[in-house]
């Protein structure tokens, strides 16, 4: 079976979105700790206040500068929903919020399964911008320029994608690496591999 017959049928999952949120105002973290339940604040240990939401399941680190780091969202939509819920909670407990929060995604971490086997030795030899030291780590590390992401590619066809700023960059990166690996004859259908074992 030639690689032109290898079909593209990945499963891609967003695992985590890390974003910064700017409120453009300073916050009284001590007042927040006193009035809002289930908040952790120990300035001797960490300068930010830890605010955990159950729905959606995210954690926000809130700093007195009015900046937040929000992590745990599985989609941009979920991230926006979480930020709105955090702001609503702050307002509910008497924290005045002026203006609209500015949200900026810093990193999207995703996983993917190409449903093919990947010849990492061959890929390491033929791909540029990669690092593959199987004695140290079983995956090939590939730095893609467009979109600007890093992919950890495993022989099972599974991978981790990090560094994306938008969800569509993840899908684009997975499609591009699949096409490149297929073009370089580095992928093999899983069925073909299983037939060889029989």
From Swiss-Prot:
Gene that produces this protein: tbp
GO biological process: DNA-templated transcription initiation
UniProt Sequence repeat ranges: 14-90, 105-181
Family matches, as HAMAP family: TATA_bind_prot_arch (MF_00408)
Organism ancestry: Archaea, Thermoproteota, Thermoprotei, Sulfolobales, Sulfolobaceae
GO molecular function, one term: DNA-binding transcription factor activity
PROSITE patterns cross-referenced by the UniProt entry: TFIID (PS00351)
Organism in which the protein naturally occurs: Saccharolobus solfataricus (strain ATCC 35092 / DSM 1617 / JCM 11322 / P2) (Sulfolobus solfataricus)
Keyword list, A-Z: DNA-binding, Repeat, Transcription, Transcription regulation
Top-level taxon of the source organism: Archaea
Similarity annotation: Belongs to the TBP family.
UniProt xrefs under PANTHER family: TATA-BOX BINDING PROTEIN (PTHR10126)
Function: General factor that plays a role in the activation of archaeal genes transcribed by RNA polymerase. Binds specifically to the TATA box promoter element which lies close to the position of transcription initiation.
Name this polypeptide is given: TATA-box-binding protein
InterPro entries: TBP, TBP_archaea, TBP_CS, TBP_dom_sf
